[in-house]
């Protein structure tokens, strides 16, 4: 069996194994992948989605910064992607038969000083994943630096329920929505106080949603629609004595 045929066979096996593991049904798309954040992934904490400490939020080190073409101004925050290294294009740099699922937690910004095929990997319209090093090394050989990949969105699995962190000041509420399963990302969100109806929030940045309702002293409820189209209400999540900076966990979770 020649090298080309071996590479194609390895890729087929990796894709089959990945689909079986991730329950994926969508088509595969080509992209490229690099890594950042150090061997322990600590440099990936924070990021343009606003998740902060990814260990505390339940996302861990299997995460990635998305190129501008994939990030969608923060609407992709929390989405999960199944990624395999394309052995048909770089057999010497791929770990055959492997796959990894990563969560979108950051933006890989464009680098206009470099060409898209010569260092400006995240320049539009390129689909690119700048993965945590531990995640990337599950599919690629360290010395490569960059590898061709195939990817698709898959369902996110999370432990526990959806969480809401309420920041802000006075009449301004900034709500970070985390630990979202199913499609992983939020399409729209609402907030409600004890004495109000549902008030639609707008995306401030990343996974942070804002309201100018001034709801201090009222118990807070939330409603969320995921990008998969599932709508859930989370009643009386925060008691009337809530304080800015607190995080509130729920027992509800999304399926899609």
From Swiss-Prot:
Any single GO CC term annotated in Swiss-Prot or TrEMBL for this entry: extracellular region
Broad class of the protein's primary localization: secreted
Keywords for this protein: Cell wall, Cell wall biogenesis/degradation, Membrane, Secreted, Signal
GO biological process: plant-type cell wall loosening
Pfam families: DPBB_1, Expansin_C
Membrane topology (UniProt): Peripheral membrane protein
Cross-referenced InterPro entries: Expan_Lol_pI (IPR007118), Expansin (IPR002963), Expansin/allergen_DPBB_dom (IPR007112), Expansin_CBD (IPR007117), Expansin_CBD_sf (IPR036749), RlpA-like_DPBB (IPR009009), RlpA-like_sf (IPR036908)
Keyword Cell wall biogenesis/degradation in annotation: yes
Signal peptide span: 1-26
Domain Expansin-like EG45 per the UniProt entry, residue ranges: 46-161
Domain Expansin-like CBD positions: 171-250
Record localization: Secreted, Cell wall; Membrane
Family: Belongs to the expansin family. Expansin A subfamily.
Function: May cause loosening and extension of plant cell walls by disrupting non-covalent bonding between cellulose microfibrils and matrix glucans. No enzymatic activity has been found. May be required for rapid internodal elongation in deepwater rice during submergence.
Stated name of the protein: Expansin-A31
Taxonomic classification: Eukaryota, Viridiplantae, Streptophyta, Embryophyta, Tracheophyta
Protein's gene: EXPA31
